[in-house]
């Protein structure tokens, strides 16, 4: 069974911990992508136009004999209305609010995707390909004292000592305005993901680190493929606590 060094809050190695079998899972980018896309699809809200959008007009057709197309026209005007190719008219085939856009993933596939994404966090090549900046040896396992940190300043000091804070700064200054119409729809900026911190239990670290740019903090029970592989790309820079490593034993089987 593979082992990993354990670091304290100053970034120094203080021991070793045996890694559970989940870290030996095969890399399956196809299953990871399938699980992440399903999670994103299942968050979608129903959307579509109002039932009478583009139809609320008194337009009517002129009929034959005028040498013009047979389209509804506004009263006392020759301007076309209501039809899809007219300004302000209805859409031809709009999205239907009643459509089922959810996606299903087999339970065994979903669990295997999580195991594969967990194993990918130990591969320096995959982590580097995601753009993460780090100096520490992977996987990064911290002592349980990390879970008791209550202030964001303390978390920053730990990340600096572990050689991970540069990645947080990369996410902080990497925010940029998105291209396209999404700017008008409540998603003006695109944000980068940085460090994922996984704790064993619901401890103070979950609140202390959550306001750092790009940082996500979760318990083992809340892990999913999207947290481990944002945008379907596996190899997220992840910090595990000793208790989290212990809870991974036999998990997601």
From Swiss-Prot:
Residues 95-107 have a biased composition (Basic and acidic residues). Keywords: Ribonucleoprotein, Ribosomal protein, RNA-binding, rRNA-binding. Residues 82-94 have a biased composition (Basic residues). One of its GO terms (molecular function) is rRNA binding. Residues 78-107 are annotated as: Disordered. It holds the Pfam family Ribosomal_L4. One of its GO terms (biological process) is translation. GO terms for cellular component: cytosolic large ribosomal subunit. PANTHER family: 60S RIBOSOMAL PROTEIN L4. HAMAP family: Ribosomal_uL4_A. Part of the 50S ribosomal subunit. One of the primary rRNA binding proteins, this protein initially binds near the 5'-end of the 23S rRNA. It is important during the early stages of 50S assembly. It makes multiple contacts with different domains of the 23S rRNA in the assembled 50S subunit and ribosome. Forms part of the polypeptide exit tunnel. Belongs to the universal ribosomal protein uL4 family. This is Large ribosomal subunit protein uL4. The lineage of its organism: Archaea, Methanobacteriati, Methanobacteriota, Stenosarchaea group, Methanomicrobia. The gene is rpl4.
């Amino acid at each position: 069974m593979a082992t990993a060094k354990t670091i304290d809050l100053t970034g120094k190695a203080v021991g070793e911990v045996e890694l559970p079998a989940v870290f030996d899972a095969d890399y399956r980018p196809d299953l990871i992508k399938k699980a992440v896309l399903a999670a994103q699809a299942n968050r979608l809200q129903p959307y579509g136009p109002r039932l009478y959008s583009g139809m609320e007009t008194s337009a009517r057709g002129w009929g034959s004999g005028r040498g013009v197309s047979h389209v509804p026209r506004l009263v006392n005007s020759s301007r076309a209305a209501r039809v899809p190719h007219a300004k302000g008219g209805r859409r031809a085939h709009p999205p239907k609010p009643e459509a089922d856009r959810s996606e299903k993933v087999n339970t065994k596939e979903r669990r295997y995707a999580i195991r594969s994404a967990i194993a990918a966090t130990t591969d320096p090549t995959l982590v580097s390909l995601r753009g993460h900046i780090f100096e520490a040896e992977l996987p990064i396992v911290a002592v349980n004292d990390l879970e008791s940190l209550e202030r964001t300043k303390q978390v920053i000091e730990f990340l600096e000592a572990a050689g991970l804070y540069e990645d947080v700064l990369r996410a902080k200054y990497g925010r940029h305005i998105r291209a396209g119409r999404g700017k008008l729809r409540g998603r003006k900026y695109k944000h980068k993901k940085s460090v994922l911190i996984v704790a064993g239990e619901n401890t103070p670290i979950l609140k202390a680190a959550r306001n750092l740019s790009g940082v996500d903090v979760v318990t083992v029970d809340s892990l999913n493929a999207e947290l481990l592989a944002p945008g379907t790309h596996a190899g997220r820079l992840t910090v595990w606590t000793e208790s989290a490593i212990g809870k991974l034993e036999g998990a997601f089987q």
